[in-house]
Structures are given as C-alpha cells and as structure tokens.
C-alpha cells in the first residue's frame, strides 16, 4: 500500500473509532419498552454508558436507575434469567443491585429498583410490597412520570385497598404519562361494559390507563379491573375475592406440571373461569388477551373494541353497532391536525380499532344505515392513511382496500 493510501486508511479507522466511542459514551434515559423499545445490543451499550457515569459519581441516583433498567432489559431480551433464583442472583442486574445497596442505601431509587428486580434474599419483601411503600415514602416531587405510574401499579398489586393507590394513579394521570390516544382507547372499553362487570386485561396499555380513569376521574368504578398477571399475587387475590364476595379458590400450581412451560396459561384460565362463574358478573376481556382461546373461544364474542364471555349465543353485532353509534368516541382517530406522540404503541393501538371495527361497516350497510357506514369508513380509513407503522406500503394499501370492500358490500 502507498503512503497516501495508508494515511487514508488510518483516517477512516480513526473516524470510525471516534464515532463508535462517542456513540458508546452517550447515555440516554431508559424508557419502558411499552413506550419505546430497542434491540438488545442497544441496552447493552447503554448499560456500559451509565456504568461510566455511576463509576464517576456513585451517589448519582438517576444514573443507577438507568443502569439497572438497561442491564435488566439487556438480560431479558438477550438470554433471559433462567428458572431459578440462584441463576438470577448471578446476573448483572443482581450485581448492580448489590453495588447500589452499598452506594445509595435506603434511597428512593434503590427501593424503586428493588421493586423491578429482586434478589432471592429480597423476594418475600418485594411480594409484600415493602420496597414499593418505602419508595413512595421517599419519592421526590419531580419523580419521573413513568416511575410514578410503575409505583401506582405495584401498590395496586401488593396493597389494593391502600389510599396510596388512588393517590398515585391520580398523580400519574396529572402527569399525562400515557398518550391521549391510549387513554381514549381505554375509556371506550371501560364505558361500554355492563354494570359491575369484571374485566381481564392483558398488558400495561389496557390495564393502568383504565385504572387511572377510575381513580383520577371517578368514572365506572363499579368495574373490577384484573390484569391476568395479578392472579399470581396473594395480596391482590385476597382483596379481589373480598370485593367480589366469593370464597377463595383452592388451587395449586403444582397440579399444572402436565402443561410444561405453558402451565401458567391454564392456571390463569382456571382462575378466570372460577371468578366468572362464582361472581356471576358480566365478564370482558381485552382484545389482545391470549387466554380467551384456552377458556373457550366459542364463548367469546366481539362487542366492538372489547370481548365478552357468554356461554349463550346472542347478537353481539347489535351490541357492537350500538357501542359505535352511542358509546365510543372515535373522532380522535380522524383528527386532521394530529401529530403522533413518540410512543410506538400509539400507532399500533390505533390500528387495533381498524381491525376490530372494520367489519361493522358492512353490517351498518345491511341494516340500511348508510350514513353510519360511511362515517365509520371515513374515520378508519383516515386512521390507516396517516399511520406510520406499516413496514411496507403494500400493508397499508391492503388494509385500505379491505375497508373499501366493506363499504361497497351489497346489502
């Protein structure tokens, strides 16, 4: 190689090295994967970036908070935690917690992080909610909105009757943590349920926002919200049985070994069916709840944006059409000046409306309600047209074509 070529190679190599170092050193706030997710490698790089900040200032609580979150997500997405406490205690997040205990003992961030990740020695205290309560006691006025929401959920699970549940969810509502579009979706589901219903949620986006509406606004507090993961929490279940006025179910997880790694799905399904039958209350499921196929898919009916359990057949399309005309607020899907928030799940939530409601366009046509069919078509098609989550334009075109076919269906 000649000297000029060698110099060029060295310059390129140094440039790449500097860019790589700059990228690796840039620490960013680690957000919940519900709002903004990344590849595992990104979390690994962020863990290294936050580690440097912690090393420089071991008293920096914000740095510790982000270090634990980055390390936790990296392990979670990369190879998981294994099946035993012994394996979990050997992971990097466990090491972060131990070092945090020495650097910032009994701090707000330490207790917050112990809610998210427990060492085997802390597992009982974590289940009791000890760390959540202590974190709330130490929580600063300017606490991160995401962390306030997380502590509200932890208190709801571990001490459902505590006044802190209402206080924290109200604070989270005022923080405007969840985007308005996700709040709209949850309110639509909440408002269409029958009196004293029980509602089985699946994830963060169809649980906490609905509870927030109940606690902060006082709307539809007659509905009992149950995230399926809460079925494993003793404190939550004890309060739930009391609220529903039924005896606790005598159930043992050891009896579900025959299902292998899917044991928890059948365990949760059996508890849900017990709650439905014993309480004799109307039962609903979020549209993303996979447990409905285990319970009895022939007894699950779509009522628009929500699923209802019914052992008897009924005209669920009539209910869904009523919800669209009289209950749901869908106008926000077609707002002309909409600017999407930064949550990647907001666009997905919008398209859930399209998937769940598009077949009602032809139903309205067949009923002779052309105006409502046209109105629903316009809302849903505008929602699809401006969506930014399609990987390929063909996907958007196919969905728009499907909507058009619904509108042009013969009566």
Describe each model-derived feature in a short phrase.
Residues 1-29:
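Bacterial Sec-dependent N-terminal signal peptides
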Residues 4-5, 180, 201, 352:
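Residue-level detector of secondary-structure boundary/capping sites
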Residues 25-195, 215-411:
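ER/secretory pathway lumenal C-terminal domains and tails of membrane proteins involved
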Residues 200-204, 228-229:
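Short His-Asn-centered micro-motif
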Residues 208-209:
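Phosphate- and divalent-cation-binding pockets in alpha/beta enzyme and binding domains
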Residues 212:
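Substrate-binding cleft/loops of secretory-pathway carbohydrate-active enzymes
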């Amino acid at each position: 190689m000649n000297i000029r070529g060698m110099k060029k190679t060295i310059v390129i190599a140094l440039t790449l090295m500097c860019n790589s170092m700059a990228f690796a050193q840039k620490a960013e706030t680690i957000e919940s994967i519900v709002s903004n997710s990344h590849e595992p490698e990104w979390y690994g790089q962020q863990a290294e970036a936050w580690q440097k900040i912690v090393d420089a200032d071991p008293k920096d609580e914000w740095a510790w908070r982000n270090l634990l979150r980055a390390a936790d997500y990296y392990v979670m997405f990369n190879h998981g935690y294994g099946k035993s406490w012994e394996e979990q205690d050997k992971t990097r997040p466990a090491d972060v917690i131990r070092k945090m205990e020495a650097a910032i003992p009994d701090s707000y961030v330490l207790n917050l992080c112990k809610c998210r990740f427990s060492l085997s020695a802390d597992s009982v205290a974590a289940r009791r909610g000890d760390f959540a309560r202590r974190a709330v006691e130490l929580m600063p006025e300017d606490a991160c909105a995401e962390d306030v929401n997380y502590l509200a959920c932890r208190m709801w699970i571990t001490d459902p009757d505590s006044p802190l549940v209402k206080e924290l969810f109200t604070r989270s509502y005022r923080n405007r943590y969840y985007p308005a579009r996700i709040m709209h979706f949850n309110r639509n589901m909440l408002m269409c349920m029958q009196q004293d219903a029980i509602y089985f949620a699946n994830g963060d986006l169809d649980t906490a926002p609905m509870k927030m509406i109940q606690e902060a606004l006082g709307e539809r507090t007659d509905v009992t919200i149950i995230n399926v993961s809460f079925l494993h929490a003793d404190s939550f279940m004890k309060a739930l049985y009391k609220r529903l006025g039924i005896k606790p179910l005598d159930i043992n997880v050891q009896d579900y070994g025959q299902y292998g790694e899917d044991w928890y799905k059948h365990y949760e399904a059996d508890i849900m069916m017990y709650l439905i039958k014993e309480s004799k209350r109307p039962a609903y499921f979020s549209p993303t709840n996979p447990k409905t196929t285990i319970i009895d898919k022939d007894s699950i009916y779509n009522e628009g944006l929500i699923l209802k359990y019914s052992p008897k057949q009924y005209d669920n399309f009539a209910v869904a059409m009523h919800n669209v005309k009289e209950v749901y607020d869908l106008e926000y899907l077609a707002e002309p000046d909409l600017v999407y928030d930064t949550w990647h799940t907001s666009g997905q939530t919008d398209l859930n409306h399209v998937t769940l409601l598009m077949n009602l366009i032809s139903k309205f046509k067949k009923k002779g309600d052309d105006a409502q069919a046209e109105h629903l078509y316009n809302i849903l098609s505008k929602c699809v047209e401006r969506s930014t989550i399609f990987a390929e334009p063909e996907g958007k075109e196919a969905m728009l074509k499907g909507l058009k076919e619904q509108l042009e269906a013969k009566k």
